[in-house]
Amino acid sequence: MTLFTVSCLLVVLFLCHSLVHAENNGYYGYTPTVANYLPEKPQNIMNPVDSCWRLKSDWAANRKDLADCVVGFGSSTLGGKKGNLYVVTNPYDNAQNPQPGSLRYGVIQAKPLWITFAKDMVITLENELMVNSYKTIDGRGAKVEIAYGPCITIQDVTNVIVHGISIHDCKPGKYGMVRSSPTHVGHRKGSDGDAIAIFGSSNIWIDHCYLASCTDGLIDVIHASTGITISNNYFTQHDKVMLLGHNDDFVQDVKMKVTVAFNHFGPGLVERMPRVRRGYAHVANNRYDKWIMYAIGGSADPTIFSEGNYFIASDKSNSKEVTKREVKGGWNNWRWRTSKDVFKNGAYFVPSGYGSISLPYSSAQRFTVAPGNLVPSLTADAGPLNCNRNGPCY
């Protein structure tokens, strides 16, 4: 067999893998464009989060083991691990008086719950979904979409896991009454139309979700939220993708620590992957496919460590730079560093700052970051997985 024949076979296999994965995970008629770059290693290597649980055929009987697999700043997140299972049996929603069997009824409870789904469903929420502390929303084993209405709000709570669901076409919430616990219904002034908005919360993990086409952002982490890990997600077809930090004047965001790892920032994304203010962002082993404006940006002196990412620049000559500082000057001392990153199609990263940028991870938070050339394999299954209850998740 000639070298040319082997190369052709590799191209065909990679294309098939990408298209099948997109279809299996319900990318709603949109097939992600496969970049014209072959992965630089085989397709059988998993990242540290996935290797912790995905190959176990008994995952459905031991769902809560997932909580042991989070890495990075959100590694202490328990979700509903210490609670009972709650099964969503129907997609119907009532913002003020949710009924048993609905998603909203589960997420507002005061006790820990691990929430699963009895069947495939599309949930269109009446108003924003207020998630209480110690909850896991676990979509494995079903195709679950939250779409075409307001979406998820995580506000002033702790220990929330959102895993394996698709969140897209989110709309602004309405002014009105929304229940946030069994004993409290409060006035809401209307949400912005984010897929997931995280306010003043800690120990949050967003993993293996599909996020696209919302009115405002896909993920916002603001108001001094910290202890956040955003991993294994597939982002596509959106403008302002991920905001970390409320505004330049909100000094409390200096405590914010966020890990962004093993995500696939796919086609049709414009900017903010992420955009950071004041806090610390570890951006590691992510794949970026042809952003339109920039990939990683920020203002107000954030610390950004870009490690082992795989950047494929747009074909446009004015969109090659990975980074963007949202000020005209004074950013030379901001600590923005790159290590082990791979740059394709003319992509480049402009570093800045002096002194150490060592990761402030505890031993429990620390994980191995691979060289950037391995990222196409490590992110190949970003987004919701195809999980059969009687076998491993693919």
From Swiss-Prot:
Source species: Arabidopsis thaliana
Biological processes, Gene Ontology terms: pectin catabolic process
Listed name of the protein: Probable pectate lyase 16
Annotated binding of Ca(2+), by residue: D192, D216, D220
Co-factor binding details: Binds 1 Ca(2+) ion. Required for its activity.
Cofactor annotation: Ca(2+)
Catalytic reaction(s) noted: Eliminative cleavage of (1->4)-alpha-D-galacturonan to give oligosaccharides with 4-deoxy-alpha-D-galact-4-enuronosyl groups at their non-reducing ends
Family that this chain belongs to: Belongs to the polysaccharide lyase 1 family.
Enzyme Commission number, as recorded: 4.2.2.2
The keyword Amino-acid biosynthesis is annotated on this UniProt entry: no
Pfam families (UniProt xref): Pectate_lyase_4
Pathway recorded for this protein: Glycan metabolism; pectin degradation; 2-dehydro-3-deoxy-D-gluconate from pectin: step 2/5
UniProt KW keywords: Calcium, Lyase, Metal-binding, Signal
Keyword Nucleotide-binding in record: no
Gene3D superfamilies: Single-stranded right-handed beta-helix, Pectin lyase-like
Active site annotation, chain numbering: R272
GO molecular function annotations of the record: metal ion binding; pectate lyase activity
